[in-house]
Curated annotation (Swiss-Prot):
Expressing tissues: Synthesized by the fat body and is eventually secreted into the hemolymph.
Pfam family of the protein (one): Attacin_N
Modified residues (Pyrrolidone carboxylic acid): Q25
Family: Belongs to the attacin/sarcotoxin-2 family.
Sites of Glycine amide modification: G264
Keywords tagged on the record: Amidation, Antibiotic, Antimicrobial, Immunity, Innate immunity, Pyrrolidone carboxylic acid, Repeat, Secreted, Signal
Protein name: Sarcotoxin II-1
Source organism: Sarcophaga peregrina
Domain of life from the UniProt record: Eukaryota
Prosegment residue ranges: 23-24
Amino acid sequence: MKSFVLFAACMAIIALGSLAHAYPQKLPVPIPPPSNPPVAVLQNSVATNSKGGQDVSVKLSATNLGNNHVQPIAEVFAEGNTKGGNVLRGATVGVQGHGLGASVTKTQTDTKIKGLDFQPQLSSSTLALQGDRLGASISRDVNRGVSDTFTKSVSANVFRNDNHNLDATVFRSDVRQNNGFNFQKTGGMLDYSHANGHGLNAGLTHFSGIGNQANVGGSSTLFKSNDGSLSLKANAGGSQWLSGPFSNQRDYNVGLSLTHHGCGG
C-alpha cells in the first residue's frame, strides 16, 4: 500500500512538472509609474515706470509636458501700463533637452484685442546650448518695419555650492534699423543668486557711437508657501548712462512678482 502511495505521488509530481513545462508561468511585466501631470504656472508682476503709471505683466506657462529627456516649452503672455496705451501680447513655443534648446516667440502690440486676427509684429527665435558649467546661445529679433537684431552670448558658472551661485555672461548684439541707423551692443553681466530666493545682478553695456550704460538689480523672496506652489518676490533695479549724449541720465524701477504653480490634470 505504501509503495502504491509513493508511486502515485511520483506520478503526480511528474504530471505537474509536465504541465509547468507545457504552460510556463509568465512573470508580470512591471508597469512604470505615471509621469508627473502637466502643471500650469501663472506669473503676475507690477513695476513702476519712470514715464508714468505701472507696468503690469501676466504670463501663463505649462511645465511637465514631456519626460526626463525632452521638455516642450509653451507659454502665453501680455504686458501693458495702467495709464493705457499699447498692449503687448504673445506666445512662445519650443523644446529643450540634453543640454539643447530652441524656441520661437511671436508678439503683437495693439490698442485692442482683435480676436483671432493674430498678426505678429515682433518675431524672436533662439537656439541655446547649456552644459553643466558653460552655455551659449544665438537669437534673432525681427521688429517688423523697425529693426532686426542678431545676438550672440556665452555664459559660465563662476561659483556654485549648496547656497550660493554666481554666473557671468558676455554678449554682442548687431542692431540694424530700417531708418539706416545701425549699431552694436557689447557687454557683460554678473548674476548672483541664493538658495533662499534672493538675487543680485550688475552689468555694463557699450552702445557703439552712443555711449556706455550701467545696470544693477536685485530681488528678494518675501513669501513662499510650504509646498512651494505660491511665492511673492520684490524686485528693484536701476540704470545710468556713463557717457555719450545721455550721460548721467538715470532710470529706476521697483515691483512685485507673484507666481502660482497650479495643479496638473
